[in-house]
Amino acid sequence: MRSLKLLLCWISFLTLSISISASSDDQFTLDGTVLELTDSNFDSAISTFDCIFVDFYAPWCGHCKRLNPELDAAAPILAKLKQPIVIAKLNADKYSRLARKIEIDAFPTLMLYNHGVPMEYYGPRKADLLVRYLKKFVAPDVAVLESDSTVKEFVEDAGTFFPVFIGFGLNESIISGLGRKYKKKAWFAVSKEVSEDTMVSYDFDKAPALVANHPTYNEHSVFYGPFEDGFLEEFVKQSFLPLILPINHDTLKLLKDDERKIVLTIVEDETHESLEKLYKALRAAAHANRDLVFGYVGVKQFEEFVDSFHVDKKTNLPKIVVWDGDEEYDQVTGIETITQEEDHLTQVSRFLEGYREGRTEKKKINGPSFMGFINSMIGIRSVYILVFLVAVIMMLRSLGQVEEPTGVRTATAVRERVDQATTVPEDESSEHKPSDKKED
């Protein structure tokens, strides 16, 4: 009997020890460092933190190695947010059974778990941009602000990367649908109180009003209604872009989801101080013609793009056209350039009048289509790598040594991927091709 009691005590001791050991393994500290997860504590980590961003990596993956310092830099910033976001990583090559269970088929795969709900992340990977994107993903669709101080705090926390829409005197229900629909593109909030100081600070003179701020371009606009029948959404969509948009590799991607045609002004050097009067005229014209996008581009800044509009050394600049955003553009008869001899706004107004009256000549762009420009951003180095990989694969297949890949992404995942990458800078976008996710 005594032996049995001793045996039971020993079993109880072992059970307690194992329990204590297991629980200590699952103790996580929110100290701004990247957590290293295993197959034994993964589920516990997901349930412990409201928001956790997990990097599923392989030690041999070059992209994974380059991502490590970015995650290390972002982790302490995200940990200090009002709604902290924990960064963690898991060796999916080592814990392959868990990786297969959650369908990890490429490296690195990045997942954001928001209250346990997973969402694959395809956004930028540089630390500063990663922080901006993750803050946006976990924020409420529409923030409800109670006072002037909370309005100021909201604007400061939003930063300068995304446009900010604040409905003063508007009910949350009026913009909740837009906040949900365009969550990845802008910040949305409503303020219950509308003080005189707030009206002066945000430059509107009555409520209700929806104020749009575009910090990146230092632009501001106000919508006083009507707040139904699509008018509100139209204002929001138009306000995603500034009144006049500098055209470059990154901003071309912003035009991808905008169906409006682009009034494109081509100059020699877009930074030259003599162009301020022209930009002022274009901005005034854009105010009155919100059904069009107004953009400008310099030959010096983006020559390969400008060449597509038949611009050469003999072309008189600034040249102005209406581009359909793809393969064609309209040139207004008799008004091909903006001269210094006449008021700029008068010339731009005459150009728009001629365009709307149909006094135009349609031309094909001299080069790749819009999607061609987007695709060209991967760079010639990536093309060489791709050609080399294709050659290797063909050679191996000819030897009968290559099996068909088992991991195939769904069409839905591809669409989500394109949507999230819309505003990703050029040097980031090339890292998201499936062929880039796994390497020797």
Curated annotation (Swiss-Prot):
Q: Which residues carry this modification: Phosphothreonine?
A: 160
PANTHER family, per database record: PROTEIN DISULFIDE ISOMERASE, PROTEIN DISULFIDE-ISOMERASE 5-2
Q: Where is the composition biased (Basic and acidic residues)?
A: 430-440
Signal sequence, renumbered to the chain: 1-23
Q: What Pfam family is a match, any one? A: Thioredoxin_6
Carbohydrate-modified residues: 171
In which tissues does this protein get expressed?
Widely expressed.
| Similarity-based family | Belongs to the protein disulfide isomerase family.
Q: Where is this site: Contributes to redox potential value?
A: 62-63
Question: What are the record keywords, sorted?
Answer: Disulfide bond, Glycoprotein, Membrane, Phosphoprotein, Redox-active center, Signal, Transmembrane, Transmembrane helix
Instruction: Give a GO molecular function annotation for the protein.
Output: protein disulfide isomerase activity
According to the UniProt record, one GO cellular component term is: plant-type cell wall
Disulphide bridges in this chain?
61-64
Q: How does it sit in the membrane?
A: Single-pass membrane protein
Q: What is this protein called?
A: Protein disulfide-isomerase 5-2
Q: Where is this site: Lowers pKa of C-terminal Cys of active site?
A: 125
Membrane-spanning regions, if any? 376-396
SUPFAM superfamilies tied to this protein: Thioredoxin-like (SSF52833)
Catalytic residues (positions): 61 (nucleophile), 64 (nucleophile)
